[in-house]
Amino acid sequence: MPDFLGRSVYLTEFEKQKAPLAASPAGGAPVFISLHIGEEFGPGYADRARAMCRWLSGQGWRILADVSEVTAPLFGLDDAAQLPEALGLWGLRLDDGFSLDEACALAARMPIAVNASTTTPAQAAALAAAGPEVIAIHNFYPRPETGLDPEFLQESTRMLQAAGMQVYAFIPGDQQLRGPLYAGLPTLEAHRGAAPLAAFADLAVHYGVDGIFAGDPGVSPYEQAQIARFCTEKVLPVPVELEPAHRGLYGKVFTCRPDSPQGLVRFQESRAYAKAGPPAEPAGCGARLRGTVTMDNRLYGRYSGEIQLVRQDLPADGRVNVIGRVAPRYQLLMDCIQRGSRFCMVPPSAKEAADAL
């Protein structure tokens, strides 16, 4: 599972990105930049790009630069192999203009990345054998409806990993989206409009990628904090709007019972917690729609106090209280809770809570 959220930095957005990047502990995480976006070229381009790279390196980010055959001459260099030393880069992401032989030669000297969607099994094997750190990165897709299908992402990721390569992908941001479309920059079309935490967890749990970048310039501090907790503690935070009487459940770590059915997440520890207080009285026994958090009341006998997260619509039951709901943009997270895995309920962001009113 990835242990970081990489970021994407754009020369045209850099001044606006500096403050939030400075506030985010880099810790050696990678940052993705592009050094061949034609619309950014102009007077002073090389100097501005150098200054950006110096600043990012000084903040502790490892810079992975997307380059083409025209990049080196822009900086007065003869060869792409000179770029890391000249600009303080960690590695190069090579566009499709580089031959396999050129890519293998570079891989022997530095970390490189290639296009995960176009690399064949034979090419992947050759590249993985050429150097110690070779990554395949899936593209991000600015235009709605053009992102990858789940099946293609799974199949290509498995193939590349089997050949010995690491595989990275992109999730959308939730602040300062990248123009001109401002529709998010995900790899997977299903993630367009999803919260960064939800998209990150989905890629990590269901697709097994080795690294994840945010494609858009901005990720809110709330999302960064939840992703960081998932990476470091291996506890999945699930933003839930709980009824006031049950907000003491926020932050408690639960385990999904190993025998949970597909349509429910059963909170393994919940009945033990409930024994510390009086039995739950019937209240709010409404329809149990997908995303509903429920607690069995005293009418369910020994099950009183059991908490469940509902993954498929169920009818109302007088023995079951509705005590909360997963915030809409995070419902993808429910499917990321696997049998035996740990998770916790957290308050939604202030913006999410306001939008729900």
Tell me what each language-model feature is.
Residues F4, A65, A108, F140, ...:
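N-terminal start-of-chain detector that recognizes signal peptides
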Residues P244-L357:
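C-terminal functional modules
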Residues P2-E133:
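Active-site beta->alpha loop and helix N-cap motifs at the rims of alpha/beta catalytic domains
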Residues S8-V9, F75-L87, A105-T119, L160-M165, ...:
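Short secondary-structure transition/capping segments
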Residues A65-A81, D96-C104, F152-E155, V205-G215, ...:
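Electropositive, surface-exposed helix/loop patches at the edges of structured domains
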Residues S117-T120, A124-G248:
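Catalytic alpha/beta core domains of metabolic enzymes, predominantly
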Residues S8, I137, P239, Q308-V310:
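Residues in well-ordered beta-strands of folded domains
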Residues C53-L56, F75-L77, P172-Q175, R266-Y273:
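A broad, low-specificity signal for short, low-complexity segments enriched in glycine/proline
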